């Protein structure tokens, strides 16, 4: 059995301060859980490739799904370049199947758009795809990467979602899909990039209780976590053959755990999202987002 022995946390950042006052709250998770009579919160997360959302928000999705809320992951590309030996439509088909299996394991929806991997550009066409996705999902919370990253697809995903963020409420644009009556809350995944400015964690939440669910979701992306990414790191021979052993191996990889930043710990303690002892003992942070705040944002 996988264990999050050193503590696992969500860290999030608000791209626009005006939303911060709408979302921050100091209620405990147990108090939030008691509010299950509320309509489901609708969350949509965007990534550049199948598996990006899983890494960035797998714990988030697990927590919301457990509350009966609605979560959808969207990959802007089909991932048809992310493998050392498979390519094109064969790989795209495989990665879509892996994404659907990952969503099934967690009880969320997963969609893979048919844009080419490594060739994503911030075009009007893709922006309108994102506007449609947000509107059709009737999203209240939208999550995306910051527009600074080593990978152009990641950067442009952040730019595209940012460019769509206001347009989702403009009725005269993308008229084939009804505009939202109010703007969702937009949030960034956590990251470790320091330029042009380091990531600021506005909310940090423990995901110890759903860490195994996140790893089980990542495990569905066989082409990535057991083939492509180990190959790029020169570690392919280290991947265990036994399915149970390789899942355990995956849970211990740096891609699944990140050293907790001091300022993230400060954010966690300041907002009192978890018990004091949990805060003090947490040594690791997830490449994750948040949960909890959607309930508070709803007026």
PLM regions: where:
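Bacterial N-terminal signal peptides
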Residues: 15-31
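Flexible loop residues that form catalytic
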Residues: 79, 147, 191
């Amino acid at each position: 059995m996988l264990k999050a022995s050193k503590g696992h946390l969500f860290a999030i950042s608000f791209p626009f301060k005006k939303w911060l006052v709408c979302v921050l709250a100091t209620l405990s998770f147990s108090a939030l859980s008691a509010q299950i009579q509320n309509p489901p919160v609708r969350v949509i997360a965007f990534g550049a490739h199948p598996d990006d959302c899983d890494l960035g928000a797998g714990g988030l999705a697990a927590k919301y799904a457990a509350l009966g809320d609605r979560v959808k992951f969207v990959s802007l590309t089909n991932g048809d370049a992310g493998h050392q030996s498979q390519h094109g439509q064969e790989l795209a088909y495989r990665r879509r199947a892996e994404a659907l299996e990952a969503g099934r394991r967690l009880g969320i929806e997963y969609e893979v758009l048919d844009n080419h991997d490594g060739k994503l550009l911030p075009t009007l066409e893709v922006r309108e795809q994102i506007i449609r996705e947000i509107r059709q999902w009737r999203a209240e919370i939208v999550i995306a990467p910051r527009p600074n990253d080593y990978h152009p697809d990641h950067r442009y995903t952040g730019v595209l979602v940012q460019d769509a963020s206001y347009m989702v409420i403009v009725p005269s644009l993308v008229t084939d899909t009804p505009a939202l009556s109010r703007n969702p809350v937009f949030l960034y995944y956590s990251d470790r990039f320091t330029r042009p400015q380091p990531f600021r964690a506005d909310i940090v939440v423990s995901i110890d209780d759903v860490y195994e669910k996140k790893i089980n979701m990542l495990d569905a992306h066989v082409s990535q976590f057991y083939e492509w990414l180990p190959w790029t790191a020169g570690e392919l021979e280290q991947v265990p053959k036994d399915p149970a052993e390789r899942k355990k191996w995956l849970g211990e990889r740096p891609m699944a755990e990140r050293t907790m930043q001091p300022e993230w710990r400060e954010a966690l303690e300041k907002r009192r999202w978890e018990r004091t002892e949990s805060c003090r003992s947490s040594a690791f942070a997830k490449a994750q987002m948040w949960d909890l705040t959607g309930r508070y944002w709803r007026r």
